[in-house]
Each structure stands twice: as C-alpha cells, then as structure tokens.
A protein has these predicted regions:
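Aromatic-rich, lipid-facing transmembrane alpha helices and their immediate juxtamembrane interface loops
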Residues: 1-388
C-alpha cells in the first residue's frame, strides 16, 4: 500500500498555496532567501538553455528532463511507505502540502548545471556521466547541510538509510545525488548523442527514459553499495562510490580536451558564484535557534512503536519528545503535539559546533566555484572553439 499521496491536497491541514514572504520571513528568514535563490537560478538556467543557438534544443531538453525526472523522483519517494522519510517546510508558494514550488527548481539546479558544465569537457559517455554525478553532489551538498540546520525540512528520526550523517546531512542523501544525477546524465547523453538535432521523437524518448529509469537504476547502485555498511548507507559506501566514480573519470580524462565554453556560459558562471557564496553567508548571518517550522513532519505519537519494511529494516513509526535525536526541539511551543499529529511546529536548535559547520559549507562553496568555473571555461584565457 502506498503512503499518503504527496499530491493529496489534504484539506484538513492548514496549508496555503501562497504565503506572504513577510510572514514567512518572520518565522524562517533564511528559508525565504533559499527559496527564491533556487527559483532565480532555475530561471537563469532556462534563459541560458534558450540562448544556446544551434544547441538550444539539446539544452532546453536537459532543463525539462531535469525538472520532470527530479520531481518524479521526489513524488515517488514521498509516496512509498517506509521510504517516506522527509518533510519540507512550508514555502511562500506551495504546489501541495508537501511540495514547495522551489523543490522542482532545486532539481533543475543540481541536475542541469552539472550536466551542461560537464558537456563542455568532451569526455567519453561513461566518464562524462559519472563526473556529472560528482559535480551534482558538489552542488547539492552545501544546500543539504544548510537546509537541515535551518529546518528547511525535517528528516525521519529513526530511519536507518538516513541515520549516518555528516554535518547533519545523511550520507545516504549524498550517495543518492551522486548515483541519481549520474544515471540521469548517462541516459540523457546516450539519447541526445544519437540525434544531435534532438527531434520530437528524441525529446519524448529522453523524457520517458529519464523519468522512468533514473530512480530505478539509482536504487540498484545504492542497494549494492550500502552492503559495505551492513545494508545502509555509510562511510565505506560513500568512499567506495567516490573512488569508483573518480577512477572512471580519471581514465577518460586523458582522452578529453580542456573544457570549452559556449556563448552564454557566463550566466552560469555568475550563477554558481552567487549560489556557492550565498549558502555560507546564510550560515554567518542567521541563527538557527530563531527559526520556527510549522509544517508536516513525522507523525507524532507513542515512543518505540516499530514498523518494518520489506527488506527487514525497522524504524519507529512515530516521533516522540521523550526520545528523539534531530536538529530541532519543541522549546518554542506551549504544548507538545497531540498523538497522531502530522502537522505541528518545531523549533531550530543553536549551533553545537559552528566552526565545523561553517568550514564545511565554506569549503564546499570554494571548491564548487573552482570546479564549475573550470568546467565552464571561466579559468582559461583562451576559450577555443565553442563546446557542446
């Protein structure tokens, strides 16, 4: 049986399609910045795709493929029971109670940006796809850390696949981005490489394949890799996927020329610089303890009620105040949620190690700027002929 459908409009819940940015700023100011940052970046990515001349169809297809495949993945994993392990904060524009408008834009960003950036390298198909996965993870990682810290979403408290975390971000989340984006890129690249003109048939085939197969092939990779950590994502599995992907990329790099920028790539270079600078600035300028997230969360109820999935993994069905370990609290509310509540308010917690979190986000930001500027031709004086 499926979990409650993510597209269920849930009239019994106090959600709104539109919320005043001023009202949201009072509760979660950093989230308002993050929401409109991603919407703006996705719009810039579309403008970039549209300005690609004879390569317009290829780039616009990449944009829409990322939007559709990414959103489909999100909906699938919200719908599946005992995979359903994350809940988004209420944004100023909501599509459903669980899906803010900005989330499809997030998928566009961490899938379109690395896909087209790696196209400039002219790598062979498999190394090209795996480098796209690594670059996608680099784009996503600082957002994964900042968003969790400032309660832009909440995680299931006892779900084994997301239990192992680095700076508050599940290792499983990092591995998912690497494998999902790499799979998406491989499928998309193989389809468009066979039809550079990108006919209508190619568009339909590419959209169908990336939407239908990316998540499935990602799950196959994840299932194999996480056996290194006893069946759940962990440090060994993360190191293994990084090493395998990096080795394949290195083997193909010798056959690739230096990245060649295309007209219009300057907008992507500027966008990544703004993005990778904005997230460290959010860490510096805002206090997570002042953030209040009233939204859907893990259902509140009795402690230690077990639920078991088809793989045999167990987790506690409910969140309970007496025994949970998440980066939020109930300190700002007058009373705890009623048993069975799926909509309630949680309060951000102060930094426990601000220097570590800051170093992680700033380091990823600096590395991200360097990698993307290199891939997009921003670190070379002679740009040569336009790339793909």
């Amino acid at each position: 049986m499926l979990a409650e459908m993510p597209w269920d409009l849930a009239p019994h819940l106090p959600w709104r399609v539109f919320m005043s940015p001023v009202e949201k700023w009072a509760a979660q100011p950093s989230f308002v910045i993050g929401e409109y940052l991603f919407i703006t970046l996705a719009a810039l990515a579309f403008a970039h795709a549209w300005r690609q001349g004879e390569q317009r169809r290829r780039h616009v297809l990449a944009w829409f493929a990322a939007l559709i495949a990414g959103t489909a993945n999100d909906m699938i994993f919200m719908a599946l029971p005992l995979v359903d392990n994350f809940w988004q904060a209420q944004a100023t524009i909501m599509i459903t109670p669980r899906l803010p408008l900005y989330i499809p834009c997030v998928y566009v960003c961490f899938m379109y940006f690395p896909t087209v950036a790696v196209w400039r390298t002219r790598l062979p198909p498999l190394p090209r796809a795996l480098l796209t996965g690594l670059a996608g993870s680099l784009f996503y990682a600082p957002y994964d850390i900042v968003g969790a810290k400032f309660s832009w979403w909440t995680w299931h408290d006892s779900d084994a696949p997301i239990a192992n975390r680095l700076l508050g971000a599940p290792i499983g989340s990092t591995m998912w981005v690497i494998t999902f984006v790499a799979t998406f890129a491989y499928i998309l690249n193989r389809v468009v490489d066979r039809d550079p003109a990108v006919s209508r048939r190619t568009v339909a085939l590419a959209i169908g394949l990336v939407a239908g197969c990316s998540s499935l092939i990602m799950m196959v990779q994840m299932t194999a890799l996480q056996q290194l950590d006893g069946g759940v994502p962990g440090v060994r599995a993360l190191l293994a996927v990084l090493a395998i992907y990096a080795a394949v990329v290195a083997s193909g790099w010798r056959r690739a020329g230096p990245p060649r920028a295309r007209p219009g790539d300057a907008v992507l270079r500027a966008a990544v610089c703004v993005y990778f600078t904005a997230l460290p600035l959010i860490m510096v300028c805002f206090d997570p303890q002042t953030h209040v997230n009233a939204s859907m969360h893990q259902t509140y109820g009795a402690c230690h009620v077990e639920a078991t999935d088809i793989t045999g993994l167990t987790r506690f069905k409910y969140l309970c105040a007496e025994d949970f370990d998440e980066d939020f609290s109930f300190a700002c509310v007058d009373r705890l949620p009623a048993a069975g509540s799926e909509w309630y308010t949680v309060c951000g917690r102060a930094h426990t190690s601000f220097p570590r979190w800051m170093a992680g986000v700033a380091g990823l930001g600096a590395l991200g700027i360097l990698v993307y500027l290199y891939l997009l031709g921003g670190l070379r004086r002679g740009r040569g002929e336009p790339g793909v």
